[in-house]
Amino acid sequence: MIESKIITPERAIEFVKSNDQIVTGLGCSEGRAFLSVLHQRADDLKNVHISNCLPMATLPYMEPEYKDSFFLDGWFYSPVMRRMHKQGNASFIPNNLHMAAMHRLDAIKPNIYVGVCTPPDKHGYVSLSTGNTYERRMIDAADLVILEMNKNFPRTFGDVELHVSKVDWLIDADYDVPALPNIETSEKDEKIGQLIASQIDDGDNIQVGIGGIPNAVIKALYGKKDLGIHTEMLTSEVARLAKAGVITGDRKSLHRGKMVTTFIMGDQELYDFCDENPAVMVLDGNYVNRPDVIAQNDNQVSLNTTLEIDLTGQCASESIGPIQYSGTGGQADTARGAQEAKNGRSFIALYSTAMVKNRETGEREEKSKIVAQLTPGAIVSLQRSDVDRVVTEYGIAELRGKSVVQRVELLIGIAHPAYREQLLFDARRMGIIGGH
């Protein structure tokens, strides 16, 4: 059956028409064999929109010279998308992850879906491998489905099995699964990781992402027992913790014994761990990240990071001022879901300071990341009423249910000591709290 479906990337791009809406898989599953040659059609095409999420490869079609032909709409910005945004051929799609696919389908009709799959099994089923954040819904809605069949991708289970009869065309691909570099943890990361780990108990269920702080939290959990996983992203550090026997899922109240995720991204060790592993379930993002589903996990712990937080608890996690940097992703989904769970907890972590470029002088200068007022134009990813526990290297501020006056005091208490007096002065001057 599959031989008649196999075509070259050059043949596949012939199906693209001007004004088409193309959707690509997330991250590793972006379909880079197809996208690597797409620029060859630039002279024939106008206004082709490509919806993507966390694209990893810098490819020719992204160059400014092709922006009249190809425009990218992204659910979550990567360094590639930040560069394209700056040059004028990319834009952000505001979303909460659990509704990203449905809301996009309200706005567009996908003409072509491009992604990655494994070779079919003996029953004719391929696996969508590293993700189903929105992929299966887009496949079901698309006029034409083109998948790059790649034996190097892990065969995973969950909602990712797709019969080859549902695929219009296959591209025979043989590149390695795109990998992320391992992120070293700093002294600040490790301090924050230890603080958060001290509030995680045996049997807790964890949601965690990637980066220095999340990695440090995972590394601080090796003394725990019977942890579970219900997470948006499955990472290399989580796989290592599972291989060490710390993650068993034996005490989970939902999907006992299973590590539930919506996408997988990390190193080759992670991909090998997930390959044909029945303990890993890759499920639809609308299910995994829906707050009411997350809340069914007793003892759910959510860990997210932010770029800036004001003294009332508003988190600007995806932009630097008005300029898009990353995305909302599942931050609001997981923070809300965890707090609705029995004995659930949500952590927002950040360094107390950052080195920020002065727009006037061009020099980098230290700035407090806990501020009286967010940077003008900053996008609020998590509203203050959804913030539970905030962590810096100076401690933990428990904000859930607290008044603004209490929040100001608690957040100043975990700010860098050099900025605490000014923060209190600003809070009074601006009327955030009363008194002089």
Segments (PLM) and residue ranges:
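Conserved alpha/beta enzyme-core scaffold
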Residues: 1-436
